[in-house]
Amino acid sequence: MYVTTLPSPLGDLYLASDGTALTGLWIAGQKYFASTLPAEVTENPSLPVFRQTENWLQAYFAKAPLPSLPPLRPEGSPFRQAVWALLQEIPSGQTRTYGALTQQLKAMGIPAAPQAVGGAVGHNPISILIPCHRCLGADGSLTGYAGGLEKKKFLLELEGAL
């Protein structure tokens, strides 16, 4: 497992990779920080997937046209994978409620409850690129962001969703 750190307007971002795909992206101080990392990691800032992620993040924070996402490989249960896949379908500048995601999962034949969806969203190991910040409470309120509500607000304002 390989790791590196990148500066950002949110503070340091910590990246992890299996060598070919991004497996983690955490904001400094984030809840569940690096929870999927093994004890042994190697610092390798020149890894191609890290360079691709850095280019994507630079464009994102500059509000420039986004290049292709780097390959992503988040680790999680099939339920969490389904939730994270739905998060990736939410366009920049838009949001969804936990309840709306729950209904989408049910329509796909996946039993779900908003609390379970919230748990999956909260344990997203690849922040920003899997846009869990686009998920809101039933009343449209900013709730539960592992990176902190101030950072969630910053990202949604950057995207024009607030």
Where are these predicted regions, by residue range?
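…primarily DNA-binding HTH/wHTH and HhH modules…
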Residues: 138-162
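Major-groove recognition helix of helix-turn-helix-like DNA-binding domains
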Residues: 87, 114-123
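Short cysteine clusters
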Residues: 132
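Short clusters of hydrophobic/aromatic residues that line enzyme substrate/ligand-binding pockets
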Residues: 72, 117, 142-145
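Short, basic interhelical loop/turn and adjoining N-cap
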Residues: 106-116
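Basic nucleic-acid-binding alpha-helical/helix-turn surface characteristic of O6-alkylguanine DNA
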Residues: 1-108, 160-162
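N-terminal positioning helix adjacent to the helix-turn-helix/winged-helix DNA-binding module
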Residues: 79-83, 113, 151
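Major-groove DNA-recognition helix of helix-turn-helix-type DNA-binding domains
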Residues: 129
